[in-house]
Amino acid sequence: MRRRSNNMKRCFSCFKEFNESLSVCPYCGHVEITKAEEPIYLAPGTMLANRYIVGEVVGAGGFGIVYKAWDTKLETIVAVKEFFISRLVTRAEGLKNVIISKNSKDEFDYRKERFLAEAKNMAKFGSHRSIPNVFEFFEENNTAYIVMELLRGMALNDYLNQMGGKIDVDFAIVIATEVGKALSSLHAENIIHRDVAPDNIFICTGKEIKIKLMDLGAAKLADSTDDVIDIILKPGYSPPEQYDNTKNIGPWTDIYALGATLYMMLTGVKPDESTNRKISDELVPVSYTHLRAHETDSYLV
C-alpha cells in the first residue's frame, strides 16, 4: 500500500485509499505487501514516468510483465506492460533498472524496438472496439513500457478449457466476427498480425461482453523490407508461409489463423499443422464433431 500524507495509504490491488493503521484493504481484502512477489518484478509502489504507481502483477511471461497500476493524473486504474525478456535480462531485487548482458544487448535492443512498434500499432486504433486502448508508451529503467486499458476477463484459450474444450456456434461466431473486424482494420493500414490464436484473443466481462485481439508485438507491415524476419510459429494456427523466410505473408496469413481458431472453438480440436495438411488433409465435417449446427452452418468447418 502506498502511504499518503493524511494518514491514508492506497491499496495496490483496487487502489482505493484507507487508514494506514490497517494491513488489509477493507474494500477488496488485499493483504499489504512491501516487496515484489518475485525478485525480477518491480516493487509495489514504484513510480513510473512520474505518473503511474505500480501495483500487483496480473500477468507475466517470457517476454514481459503486466502490472496493475494507478494513473495519478487521471485517477484511474490502468495496465502497464513492461518489456522484460527473461532469457536476455534480469533485475536485482528491490531495484528498478533491468540488467542486460553485453552478449544480449543487440537482440534486446532490436526486440525493444519491436515492442515499441507494437505500442504504436495499437495506438493507431484507440477507438476500435476490438483492439485494446493504448494511452502512452515510454522508455525507463533500461527498458520500455506500454500503458493500456486494464482488461477484466480471460483469454479465449482459458475460456475454452473452462468450457470443456469447445463452445456453442453462436458465441464462436460472435468471437470470430469481432476478431475479423479488428483484422480488417489492421489490414486496411497494411498491418499483418501474424499471431492470431486463442491465447491472443481476450473475452472481456462486465456489463457487456467484448472481444479484444491482443498482442500486436508480432505485427508487421505487409510491404516491409526489413532484412530480419522473425518467424512466428504457433502449430495448428500458422499457415505454411510462416514456416519459411519468403516474406510471402499478407492478410491471408491472419485469415488462415482465424479460421483455425474458429475450428478449435467449434470442435475442441486444434487443426493439424498446415505443413502436414499440405501433404494430406481431410476436413472433418460438422456432423463428426457432435455439434448441434444448422445445415447452413456446415461451411464453418
Predicted feature locations:
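AlphaC helix of the eukaryotic protein kinase fold
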Residues: 92-124
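Activation-segment/catalytic-loop signature of the eukaryotic protein kinase fold
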Residues: 137
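Conserved short submotifs of the Hanks-type protein kinase catalytic core
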Residues: 141-155
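Conserved small/polar residues in nucleotide/adenosyl-binding loops
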Residues: 289-296
